[in-house]
Amino acid sequence: MPWIQLKLNTTGANAEELSDALMEAGAVSITFQDTHDTPVFEPLPGETRLWGDTDVIGLFDAETDMKDVVAILEQHPLLGAGFAHKIEQLEDKDWEREWMDNFHPMRFGERLWICPSWRDIPDENAVNVMLDPGLAFGTGTHPTTSLCLQWLDGLDLNGKTVIDFGCGSGILAIAALKLGAAKAIGIDIDPQAIQASRDNAERNGVSDRLELYLPKDQPEAMKADVVVANILAGPLRELAPLISVLPVEGGLLGLSGILASQAESICDAYAELFTLDPVVEKEEWCRITGRKK
């Protein structure tokens, strides 16, 4: 069915209050969008991550009298008479089908493909990870995930143990297992991420080789041949003492979730214990890799 969309711009601090106002005026759903397309990473459980400059979009039934809606909103103290807004008629579409059509199999490196379940596998002889978009976790579309997948694809992981620190969807741990790792360990602070990783591992037939832990439950003295952490620069810097002890001597470390402008400070945090490779950049993001001394 067709819909009517009303969009208004506000600050992150006021966005949720105005979303309530739109719902009270008859909106059936609310969407928050960043006006400047700033990337958002995995929010904490229960957190709504908003931006400084936020578009609040209310979706209304096509039969709604939008003059009445605007009149109601003009009474709100954050808006007032003549508040800036945009009303748009949305054509009738199969929105679920359109959403699905936006996701295609993606290749990383020489062997690895990430494929949505509703798409045909492009190469039956390749290493194929079946992963559907859903929860707010990595599916390979973000440059940092892509950088990590390409790195893993280029390693000889046969018989190795891999730790995915901040596992999210489990995409990196599952890819490592499909690429030949004997065992993978996923760690995340979010119980939803642990569940998403478990579900995705079962879908890919590797759940028997994947261990998943919240930080409070992870084994002491845990070690791995390869450690990958695709989180953010702040946690990578703060957790450097913890992450640095995870690789065995001579083991490999891969870090991403880092803006190119942050690379130097992250390198400084790990240089004492690792021989670091040249930084690899993709768009505005980068990957830092090295070997444990």
Swiss-Prot record:
Entry EC no(s): 2.1.1.-
Disulfide bridges in this chain: none
Main subcellular location: cytoplasm
GO BP field: methylation
SUPFAM superfamilies according to UniProt: S-adenosyl-L-methionine-dependent methyltransferases (SSF53335)
Catalytically driven reaction(s): L-lysyl-[protein] + 3 S-adenosyl-L-methionine = N(6),N(6),N(6)-trimethyl-L-lysyl-[protein] + 3 S-adenosyl-L-homocysteine + 3 H(+)
Binding positions (S-adenosyl-L-methionine): 145, 166, 188, 230
InterPro entries per the UniProt record, alphabetical: Ribosomal_L11_MeTrfase_PrmA, Ribosomal_PrmA_MeTrfase, SAM-dependent_MTases_sf
Molecular function GO labels: protein-lysine N-methyltransferase activity
UniProt keyword list: Cytoplasm, Methyltransferase, S-adenosyl-L-methionine, Transferase
Cellular location(s): Cytoplasm
GO CC, alphabetical: cytosol
A Pfam family the protein falls into: PrmA
Xref: HAMAP family: Methyltr_PrmA
Chain's role: Methylates ribosomal protein L11.
Entry's family note: Belongs to the methyltransferase superfamily. PrmA family.
Name of the protein this chain belongs to: Ribosomal protein L11 methyltransferase
